[in-house]
Amino acid sequence: INLLKEENIFVIDNSRANAQDIRPLKIVVLNLMPLKITTETDLIRLLSNSPLQIEVSFMKLKSHTSKNTPIEHMKAFYRDFASMREERFDGMIITGAPVEHLEFEDVNYWSEITEIFDWTRTHVTSTMYICWAAQAGLYYHYGIPKYQLDKKMFGIFEHHVTEGFSHLPIFRGFDDVFYVPHSRHTEVRREDIDKCKELQVVSESDESGVHIVMARGGREIFVTGHSEYSPYTLDGEYRRDLGKGLPIDMPKNYYRNDDPEQGPLVRWRSTANLLFSNWLNYYVYQETPYDINQIR
């Protein structure tokens, strides 16, 4: 709690929460990122910027052990899917994972995560899949393949809402042009998605491609970018890869005057807040039943 307050994240205590005459929204995060505490903070910062009460739980996989997060932290804040499968949640976020170089079926937790993908359809009102999870969800649910890129998609890219979809609540308050961080070696392609009548590409970029894909009236939202990234996340990835001697270009449109010493120019923060607050309000809060056990 103190860490969240130090990050200027709005938190209320139980007594104040209980005095408010609303049911908290139950949100579960399946956190597959290596630096779990960083990802938790990034997501909670966005989820907390809402007048709604949010109760966040963290899920972990039984078939995968985190190497970069203290075991004490995992025991204190994370639960296995098996212990949560009888519960229902208003919303779920499934994060990216550093396994995109593998075929989906070769990921060591593929069996468990696809069981979770199936579970979301009967136990969660709306699920947001991010980056690798978006590709994995599109592949598992709809057969959409991923493709290896010649060069890593790395930087901040200009996006727009696809023609005909500006009325969607997910885009309320968005500018005509908005910016999103990307950090990935693979992509899904518009031509494959367009062949599936259940899917809609609702935002995209001329440079980085497909951005948001929606299905089932917003019960499934697939996001290829990382709007949740904090200002220095791409900087950390860039310097990490440089330190390892890996081939990596400087992130595009990221540093002031393309100079790493001048730090990043943040152009995606307002869009990130709108994306998550619109999702929480219009696709979770407005759609979920008051009796959470009625979620089907």
Model-derived regions, located:
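Amide-donor transfer/coupling interface in amidating biosynthetic enzymes
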Residues: 1-63, 78, 82-84, 88, ...
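Short, glycine/acidic-enriched capping/hinge loops at junctions between secondary-structure elements
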Residues: 39-42, 68-71, 104-105
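N-terminal beta-loop-helix "entrance" segment that forms/cooperates
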Residues: 62-75
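Helical hinge/lid and interdomain linker segments adjacent to catalytic or ligand-binding clefts
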Residues: 74, 78-81, 104
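Short, Asp-centered acidic motifs that coordinate Mg2+ and/or phosphate
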Residues: 91
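Cysteine-nucleophile active-site neighborhood
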Residues: 94-165
